[in-house]
């Protein structure tokens, strides 16, 4: 359901995933249902995670932490992915 309100979250990776420059990722933005945020975050730690990027992080031993959280829909998540995650990442904002 696109209109269901849940949580739009951003994770900050402790080590960039990928190579360098535009081929690397430092953040992951996702959506979780109203009461499913903790379960969704826990699933990201698994080497069998639904999200491919988080699965690779788990397999590579890359740690991460929650770095932004807001109420929103899946449409809000897609919109957030179009704009740089570092803009809403608490960790990156503190380092700037």
Regions found by a protein language model. Give the residues of each.
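GIY-YIG nuclease catalytic motif and its immediate N-terminal context
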Residues: 1-42, 46, 57-79, 84, ...
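Extended, charge-rich low-complexity interaction segments
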Residues: 88-96
